[in-house]
Amino acid sequence: MCRFLISTPFSRRRGERKAEAGRMARSVSYVSAAKLLAMARSNPRVAIIDVRDEERSYQAHIGGSHHFSSRSFAARLPELARATGDKDTVVFHCALSKVRGPSCAKMFSDYLSETKEESGTKNIMVLERGFNGWELSGQPVCRCTDAPCKGTCSPEEPEL
């Protein structure tokens, strides 16, 4: 395995490096559909955030997910921080998790850092391949119209 180290200039004082490390403490990582399903089933402190826009209204969604449209996402950051305050992990996704999902995850991470939000959120993740990949890999989906989805879609689609 190759590892790359990023060095910091010697002129930086130790305190400056520590402060920078604190600002970068919340990073965004990716999680596979299978791993997310296992996490969500075993840990009630996982929140799934769907940032698709109108697609959610005519496509299925991940059971129990919360909808925060990417179009109004920035304005709803305080609401999202409150809604996920008791969660260890928050996982974002859009259709493919190439633009909206990662962008919203980064925006949320930055918001928590900038506002010093005392939230329980420790891990901010993005679902690999997004909702389309989730569905294509055979993971359970929900077609309810509840807002927010309660995750009780049908007997063969267990609550997450």
Swiss-Prot record:
Stretches assigned to the Rhodanese domain: 42-143
Assigned GO CC terms: cytoplasm; nucleus
UniProt KW keywords: Oxidoreductase
Induction record: By arsenate.
One Pfam family here: Rhodanese
Active site: C94
Tagged with keyword Oxidoreductase: yes
Signal peptide, first to last residue: none
Keyword Oxidoreductase part of the UniProt annotation: yes
Catalytic activity: [glutaredoxin]-dithiol + arsenate + glutathione + H(+) = glutathionyl-S-S-[glutaredoxin] + arsenite + H2O
Enzyme class, broadest EC rank: oxidoreductase
Molecular-function annotations in GO: arsenate reductase (glutaredoxin) activity; phosphatase activity; protein tyrosine phosphatase activity
Biological role: Possesses arsenate reductase activity in vitro. Catalyzes the reduction of arsenate [As(V)] to arsenite [As(III)]. May play a role in arsenic retention in roots.
UniProt name for this protein: Arsenate reductase 2.1
